[in-house]
Swiss-Prot record:
Protein origin, superkingdom: Bacteria
Source organism phylogeny: Bacteria, Pseudomonadati, Pseudomonadota, Betaproteobacteria, Nitrosomonadales
Subcellular location: Cytoplasm
Subunit relationships: Homodimer.
Name of the protein described by the UniProt record: Type III pantothenate kinase
Binding-site list for ATP: 9-16, 125
Record flagged with keyword Kinase: yes
Active site feature: 102 (proton acceptor)
GO molecular function ontology, one term from the record: pantothenate kinase activity
Binding site for substrate: 93, 100-103, 175
Enzyme nomenclature, EC number: 2.7.1.33
Gene Ontology CC, one term: cytoplasm
Species assigned in the record: Nitrosospira multiformis (strain ATCC 25196 / NCIMB 11849 / C 71)
Cofactor: how and how many bound: A monovalent cation. Ammonium or potassium.
Length: 262
């Protein structure tokens, strides 16, 4: 029986997880951040993993709660942090460790998948737009409010605005639609401006690897080549786990294709 890896992406609003047997994802799940009862229920009958790899960008309390849940298994959790170089990606952040572990894992996954310059976009609670060069250099990136947060900020600061039930329109004729459409345009504009900037650096138009809760809403509004990928962070955690495991054991690091395709 193949050893099992549990990968956990603990974000600001959701916890995503997947159990991998070295070839395929056997199970995947998602729970609202802080919903310990659901995670306990989903993990209660899970086959015991031999490794646990986690990206956590939530607070220390969340890390403590996850640690308590994971204590049911013998494997010591590996909490991922960004490093200067890993899996072919070079981190050019001025302070490499300051880069969020979720962004780092997503960059690793995108590089392993594409092996060329691309934009890596996670449209979650916040949206990140990160640039990869043709040689695997993380050049830098943007952070903006996400689709829901952008509208929430305006509603909270300008309390008379109504935001419920908004939808995207070419010419919005209600406040809710104007807020929603404005947020989509702002996010799409940030992505397209970064794509144009990166195209000038690379000499070719980069593909946009898009993930996150608002990916489906954004994709139709983008005038760039888009590839939507679910669970990009989990895929990056899988690649990182394989490299760190095989490097530690003195083995040959798994090929990029093997690390990402399943």
């Amino acid at each position: 029986m193949n050893p099992l890896l549990l990968a956990v992406d603990s974000g600001n609003t959701r916890v995503k997880w997947g159990l991998h047997d070295g070839r395929n994802w056997l199970m995947q799940g998602v729970a609202a951040q802080g919903d310990r009862v659901q995670l306990e229920r989903e993990w209660r009958d899970l086959r015991e993993p031999s490794r646990v790899v986690i990206s956590n960008v939530a607070n220390a309390g969340v890390k403590g709660s996850l640690s308590e849940l994971l204590a049911q298994w013998k494997a010591e959790p590996q909490w991922i942090t960004a490093v200067p170089y890993q899996c072919g990606v070079r981190n050019y952040y001025s302070n490499p460790a300051q880069l969020g572990s979720d962004r780092w894992a997503a960059l690793v996954a995108a590089w392993v998948l594409e092996r060329q310059g691309c934009l890596v976009v996670d449209a979650g609670t916040a949206m990140t737009v990160d640039a990869l060069s043709d040689t695997g250099e993380f050049l830098g990136g943007l952070i903006t409010p996400g689709l829901d947060l952008m509208q929430k900020i305006l509603v909270e600061d300008l309390g008379s605005l109504e935001s419920e039930g908004g939808k995207f329109c070419d010419y919005p004729d209600s406040t809710a639609d104007a807020l929603y459409s404005g947020a989509v345009h702002a996010m799409a504009g940030a992505i397209e401006r970064m794509a144009a900037l990166l195209a000038g650096t690379l000499g070719h138009m980069p593909e946009c690897i898009l993930s996150g809760g608002a990916a489906q809403q954004l994709q139709p509004q983008l005038n760039v080549n888009v590839k939507v990928m679910d669970n990009l962070v989990l895929q990056g955690l899988l690649a990182i786990a394989r490299e760190t495991s095989e490097t530690a054991s003195g083995g040959v690091v798994a090929s990029p294709e093997d690390s990402i395709e399943n």
